[in-house]
C-alpha cells in the first residue's frame, strides 16, 4: 500500500494485532507516525512508532554496515550509514532488520513497498508466504507493466505460482474490468455516461452509445 496511506496502515496494524503478529513498518512510516504522535490534535489517530505491536525495519544503509562486525567499524560509522532523519530510529527499542524477519517470519506482517523489493533478497520469504497488495488496480499500460514486474519478484520467491495469478478482492465500491462489463451488459441501458473514470475508451468497447463527460459540461438524460 502507499507509504503515506496511514488509514491502510491502520488496517494492517489491526489485522496483525488480531492475529498475534507484529506489523513491521519502514522508516518513512515510522517518521510519519512520530509526527502524528507529537501533534496536539492528531496524537490519538494512529499508534506511536514505538507501539508494542509495531516493529521498525532498518534496511541496509549506503555501506551495508548493519550486519557487519562492529569491532571493525565504530558505532559512529554505523550511524553515518543512514541519513540524518533516519538515525534517531536506530535507538528505538523495537527495531528489526532482515535477520530478525528471516528467522521468525510467522511473527510478522512485513510491509514492503514496490520501491523496496530488494529487501526480499535478504528476507527470503518462505515459499507459500502470503502477499497482500492493497493498491489501485492497473488502469493504464504503464501500471500493467509495473504489476508484471512485481509479479516477477514474487514468482521468483515462490509466493505466486508460474501461472502468475493472484486472488483479487475489491472494496470501497470499486470493481475490476470484468465486473464493470458485467454490470454494463446486465443493465441493457440505452446510453452510458461514465463518471468516475479517466479511460472511457474501455466503456466504448462494451457499449455502442457512450457519452464522454467533460469538466463543467451539461448532459441531458
Where do the protein language model's features map onto the residues?
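Acidic/His-rich, metal-assisted hydrolase cores and their charged scaffolds
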Residues: 1-221
